A protein has these predicted regions:
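N-terminal Rossmann NAD(P)H-binding glycine-rich loop of SDR-like oxidoreductase domains
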Residues: 3-23
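NAD(P)H-binding glycine-rich loop region in Rossmannoid oxidoreductase-like domains
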Residues: 35-91
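Conserved Rossmann-fold NAD(P)-dependent oxidoreductase catalytic core, especially the SDR/UDP-sugar
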Residues: 90-132
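Conserved beta-loop-beta element that borders a ligand/cofactor-binding pocket
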Residues: 110, 143-166
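Glycine/proline-rich active-site loop of Rossmann-fold NAD(P)-dependent oxidoreductases
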Residues: 139, 151-153, 163-179, 215-225
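Alpha-helical substrate-binding/gating segment
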Residues: 176, 180-191, 198-232
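Mid/C-terminal beta-alpha module of Rossmann-like enzyme folds, strongest
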Residues: 212-213, 218-266, 300-303
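C-terminal amphipathic/interface module of NAD(P)-dependent oxidoreductases
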Residues: 218, 269-304
Length: 304
């Protein structure tokens, strides 16, 4: 199988590329101007891509996107987050749609933020979208693949939860919500639940995230797929489990107003103080088996 990956240098993309190469697949990255790596040249900001080089792939995986939680959501930052996902996906979708030999599948990133703040409701792939910037982003992100869908390409929307990796993403930010990791509250024994601690945090181990993407490549599933473990936890339980793995106390709560002051209200609410009790219905029904089904195992794998 020949697979092109956009975002192959990221935390998830790099592990996915290695996993596919390890089983004998041909993996080619999509590379931006100035990259020293060989691959399919593209520049989403300029709307350009090497169309001929995309001919003949079996699948394309698009994980590209500017980091959502690194900076406050100013107007400029919001636009950068939006364009890096929507415009890159539109470029890929319309390019794949006109190829003489298009790929059979486009596996495209999304997020459980699609559902907004779900409260205690169990959210399957058929649950409606929520409100707010992150929900609007995910709705537009998934809609940006429409040209590929109309061309008969099988499209999968990866609605990922919190991917457990100490090297980046939401877990990396949790370890250092107020700055660099060396002043992380958890590493100094000052961590605790954030806000009320009752918000649901859907999570998935990095290993299972990558295995689920490979599963999406190998099977005929299409449409939205919740990439989350079957046992979501509240922020309070997540924090306690993290404290046990790090061997640090978790007795000092972090008030929601502190996060809103530091991060901005919209970012703090969307990424930390709100939650989704998402369920991996499509994965389970399609025969996927999780390696890490409980949060303790997932966190041990992340720090192992």
């Amino acid at each position: 199988m020949r697979v092109a990956i956009a975002g192959s240098s990221g935390v998830i993309g790099s592990v996915l590329a290695a996993a596919l190469a390890g089983r004998g697949e041909e993996v080619i990255p999509l590379v931006r101007p100035g990259s020293s790596s060989n691959g399919v040249a593209w520049d989403p900001s300029a709307g350009t891509i090497d169309t001929r080089a995309l001919e003949g792939f079996d699948a394309v995986v698009n994980l590209a996107g500017h980091s959502i939680g690194e900076r406050r959501w100013t107007a400029v930052e919001r636009q950068r987050i939006w364009d890096s996902r929507i415009e890159s996906t539109r470029l890929l979708a319309r390019t794949l749609a006109v190829l003489e030999h298009p790929p059979a599948a486009l596996i495209n990133a999304s997020a459980v933020g699609y559902y907004g703040d779900g409260g205690d409701s169990i959210l399957s792939e058929t649950s409606p979208s929520g409100s707010g910037f992150l929900a609007d982003l995910c709705v537009a992100w998934e809609a940006a693949t429409e040209r590929a869908v109309r061309a008969g390409i099988r499209v999968v929307h990866l609605r990922s939860g919190i991917v457990l990796s100490k090297d980046g993403g939401a877990l990396g930010r949790l370890l250092a919500p107020f700055g660099p990791r060396w002043i992380s509250p958890f590493r100094w024994g000052l961590g605790g639940p954030v806000g009320g601690g009752r918000q649901w945090w859907p999570w998935i181990s990095l290993d299972d995230e990558v295995r689920a993407i490979v599963h999406a490549l190998d099977t005929g599933i299409s449409g939205p797929v919740n990439l989350v473990a079957p046992a979501p936890v509240t922020n309070r339980d997540f924090t306690r489990a993290l404290g046990r793995v790090l061997r640090r106390p978790t007795i000092l709560p972090i008030p929601g107003f502190v996060l809103r002051l530091l991060l901005g209200s919209e970012l703090a609410d969307a990424l930390v103080l709100e939650g989704q009790r998402a369920a991996p219905v499509v994965l389970i029904e399609s025969g996927f088996e999780f390696e890490h089904s409980d949060i303790a195992a997932g966190l041990r794998a992340a720090f192992g």
